[in-house]
Amino acid sequence: MDRWYRNWQHPAHAVQFDGRAHLDLRNLIRNYEAFNDVRLLNERVERSRAFELLEVGCATGEFIRYLRAKFPLVHYIGLDVSEPAIARAKAKYPEVPFFVVQADSNLTETLRDLGVTRQPDTVYSKDVVQHQVRPFEFLSSLIEVASEAVILRCRTRDVGTTVLDPERSCQFYEGDWLPYIVLNLQELVEWVRAKVPEGEIVLYRHHMVLGGQHGRFLPKELYRKETGTAETAVGIFKQTERPGTVMIYDQPEQNSTGTWDYRMRSAVRKAMKVLRSSP
């Protein structure tokens, strides 16, 4: 396996990325709907229709619980490079098709090899693009397999070109480095338009300084507010009444605080933990 993807095989990864499994359904919905990518999904996909959704980067599979609650007719497939994460997803939802895939595999060929005969209507990929060695090519693969739409969440910058070298733009995680690539927004738009010239592109930017957080080792300009870094939701719609349009909105993501009873239970658990650790 490429050294940039070894981190995802650490057993702790499945534990760290399974936090939503402990949320009840109300708080799970609140958590997901705080993000702009899920907002786009709800705005553009009819809840009453049956549709195929492929999630690329499904981790431990909790998104299926949200989808079943909000889109009861969804037909879902989840893919991830992490064997521990997929093992956890299968343990929780054995009836759901979850698959381990290779990071450098061709997505179209992978789906064919897995026996997926129908092209997914929607491809969804949350916080995966920035961890790719070749993020633009990865984006192209998502576009190619979707029949109707791609919805994703990535990292962007308004000022300065994309730094594609993962040695210069990376993140320390579970004892090793992984890519953390921040795409220039205009480069991103132009790449998508070249692939889907008649498509509609919608972007929701949540501006924030990306440098200096979560073990990231990034180019110096990404530590400055004026660079305009953001966590950005991207909707690419192949079937649309607004072909060829690009709409960019500044849309701060919400803080998911949880219901009052959930917050109370969390406070009690934290207090008990402190008491147990006291001498």
Enumerate the predicted regions with their spans.
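Conserved acidic residues
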Residues: 51, 121, 148
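A short, conserved alpha-helix within the catalytic core of class I
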Residues: 132-142
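Short catalytic/ligand-binding loop motif for oxyanion handling, primarily in non-cytosolic enzymes
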Residues: 62-65, 85, 132, 158-162, ...
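A short SAM/SAH-binding and catalytic strip from SAM-dependent methyltransferases
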Residues: 121-133
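Short alpha-helix
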Residues: 178-197, 203
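Conserved catalytic loop of SAM-dependent methyltransferase domains
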Residues: 200-237
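Conserved N-terminal segment of class I S-adenosyl-L-methionine
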Residues: 1-117, 126, 168, 230-232, ...
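Conserved class I S-adenosyl-L-methionine
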Residues: 151-176
